[in-house]
Amino acid sequence: MRLSTFFISSLAVATSAAPTWPSLQLNDIGDPLGALSAVSQYFNLVADKVSAVKTMRGSPKCDLSKAEMPTVPGLPPPAPGSKLRHVAVGRGTQNYTCDGSADSKPKAVGAVATLFNVTCMAAMYPEVTNKVSNMAVHFDLDAANRVGPATLPVSGHHYFTAAGVPFFDIGDEGQIPCAKNASADAPDTSTIGRTGERAIPWLRLLATKDATKGLGEVFRVSTAGGSPPATCKDRTGPFQVEYSAEYWFWSK
């Protein structure tokens, strides 16, 4: 598979559109300097890659065997023999609820996110991919299904079923209901959320029997924001915390 004209143009559009859309509301962000740094790092890398592509004699190859998933101590690798199928950046909310007691801890009740296709980006330009999640969490959730200023195609959606099962629908690539197999704290250097929330843990999720297209595992890595407050003080009932993350899908 070779790099498509669409992918190159997507990077170029993201760079040219930055001054006008979308706006970055620094007054609403707990760490404005960190937000500006994350966004500027993303655009600088995009500009470098667009310039490099324009001077290449041929197109770089989208070889998924070359992609290297981020790792963190304590999180097991994919099962031996697994093959990478898809990589997406998820942008959405982690959902929690409080029972009315100020001293109790918020209870996790699921998540909702739109998934944006960064598969070839992860294979060819991993340093750019790693900046997308860090950048995206600082921009408003958008009804037009855009991940901040990046013009990335939507590859699917993530949500929890009525039975509380994590579910990923990535279109033609398949559907994967799954269950948590392992968890590891996000690195201390992870991007915080818009109002200072710590990054949610990295996860390994294993498919249940109803998964399709041979999908076997999902990894949540490179997380930004999403963690709840330590207690339910001043909170009652359901609430949401915005987050972004990379999701890596592996087949058996």
Model-derived features: where do they sit?
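Fungal secretory targeting signals
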Residues: 1-23
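Primary mode marks residue(s) on the alpha4-beta5-alpha5 output face of response regulator receiver
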Residues: 21-94, 102-252
